[in-house]
Amino acid sequence: MIPNNYVEKIYAGYLGMNIGIRLGAPVEPTIWTYERIQNTYGEITGYVKDFKNFAADDDANGPYYFLRALYDDAVDRDITPNDVARAWLNYSREGIGMFWWGGYGVSTEHTAYINLKKGISAPQSGSIEQNGQIIAEQIGGQIFIDTWGLVNPCNPKKAADFGEAAARVSHDGEGVLGARFFCAAISKAFETANIEDIIEAGLAEIPSDSLYAQVARAVLAFHEQHPDDFRACRAMLERDWGYDKYTGVCHIIPNAGVCVLSMIYGQGDFNLTVEIATMCGWDTDCNAGNVGTVLGVACGLSGIGEHYRAPINDGIVMSGISGYLNILDIPTYAKELAILGYRLANVPCPPELLDNKENEIHFDFELPGSTHNIRVSDPFFCRVKHSTEQAYQGSGSLEVLFDRMTRGESSKVFYKSFYTRDDFNDERYSPTFSPKAYSGQTVSMKIYLDQWGGNAPMTIAPYVRLAKSKRDLVQGYRKLVNEQWIDVEFVIPDTEGELIDEVGIVLESDSTRKPKSLGRIFIDEFQIYGSAAYTIDFHKQAMSFGCVTPFAHNQGAWSLVDGSMYVMTAEPSESYAGNYFATDYSVEVTLNPQSGDSHLVAIRAQGAMRGYHAGLDGKDQVSLYANDFGYKKLASCTYPWKLNQEYDIKVTADGSTLTLSINGEQLLQHEDDAWSYGMYGVSTLGAARTNYRKLTITEL
């Protein structure tokens, strides 16, 4: 059964998860004991730390990336542990990002990943038999599974089964039971807000004699006797179920107790529940994130405090292998999850959901309170919020207040299309990014003026900002017309090798000092679409989170040297960038092979384990490979090439036709339809040193 408000409930649940993560993350390090949190912050009623932008977190990475097994492998059947294991290998960069790389035999996820790389398939990769009970029963079994509950609404058994399949990649025993419990609880929350019923639905999907069930029952029994004192219950957990009894870095059982504690003492209040989960210590971001998903779904958007929601502003970042996927718009993702939910339930999907195109940006502001991460450059003059007063289409739009502006005063209203290290306070989980907007694409939006004061109408000018130079490329100014919708559309100009990190409008007053401009504009149907055509000039790039912008590197040592990207590696390595969903395009790379036999260009790469690679391949040879969890040579021919000589290598994918040209000469053409979309990049199949001077990408 799919509830009528399914998309909105998913939206609330996913917001809730990320609110919990953001609230709990600052006090997650073990130095933050329960007592220290209480003595420092007392009763927590809001975020304890402000961020420019909240960096990536493993608790968000896993639910997002591992669910992609439903797109890649389990397209028309139920999920298996091996499907999810393939997502682990495909979307992770080894040793960085995604999850905690704490060492084999220390970090459960690191251990499972190495097992998978060594050919130990799931579920053996996460089993007690393989890794021992302590490693297998750490908390990760339940912290990467929220989305499996979100795509299986009102079906706790199926949600639990999917969650178990996903968790078995890395966990076993009680660790898997945590996945079953939370997926079932999330699923149940779609049909009831009664927290007791939700908890019981979770417990119904695990053995009653399990430790997980026992700690949950101990908390519920304590609550019956002491319903108003969560701190007394926390003391009971410390005494009877603490880390001294359940060892490892972060065992699931004590934290399961905190999760049930926060839900039962929170009594259906979203804010209070995530606050209690944070105040209780131990794995604060994991616990607050899990219960945040449950309570977000149960309470809906109206139950989430604006002081928690506003700083997120509908945007989060990830740290998988795709810099494009790492920039996530929550309302858009809620719709994507809903489409999966309808598919899994074998129920026809509402046509309006299917209108979304993965390779484009489309913000319709239809979900209540949605802002799609639109920002203003000057909050003194302008403020954004969701509105239902005006809408070009549907019922919602973005309202931008402009407050007493005079001639020459302005504020930018923009979508943040790309990030660098300077946009963050820290380097949590080392995210990397590829822009969401490129030269050649079209930007369009509808704008309505509701001006209350001033002696001249407001003016706007579309613009994009260049990420390295911070230079605005401003298009022509035009006057708005009061109480009318106007179309604003422009083609993003050639950025001459730079990346774009802002797309929007400059809102400027033309009023004299008295009376000042006061009023609102409404923005609706914000879109970025069409074929991109751009270059990457490495003179205009930077190192960000250890990567050359806009790439995500996997293995090898990468750097910027004299205006070029340079790799030195003793093993196979690759680097990816671009629109993850790009279909037909060419990528031309000017490279200089300096040592080694393999110097390739990637196209339609869907991760570390999927895609095409073509280029210089051994002495006097060029080849085309398909990577499908292992490289298979599709075609090759003789081509005399030399080290320390520059080559222009162009690879084109057009339908099923793949073409390799070097210095303008077509050398290979082959038909293959394994991969229809994906990123571009560069790679090597072995030890090599290569210098890359320029890339040109042209979508067909």
Label the model's feature ranges.
Residues 467-501, 639-646:
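Extracellular carbohydrate recognition and processing domains
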Residues 436-438, 446-454, 493-495, 590-596, ...:
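Solvent-exposed strand-to-loop "edge" motifs in beta-rich extracellular domains
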Residues 1-473, 500-502, 509-510, 516-531:
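Structured, active/binding-site neighborhoods that engage oxygen-rich ligands
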Residues 31, 312, 316, 320, ...:
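Solvent-exposed, flexible loop/coil residues
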Residues 362, 372, 380, 479-482, ...:
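Extracellular glycan-recognition regions
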Residues 392-396, 480-486, 583:
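Ser/Thr- and Asn-enriched, surface-exposed coil loops between beta-strands
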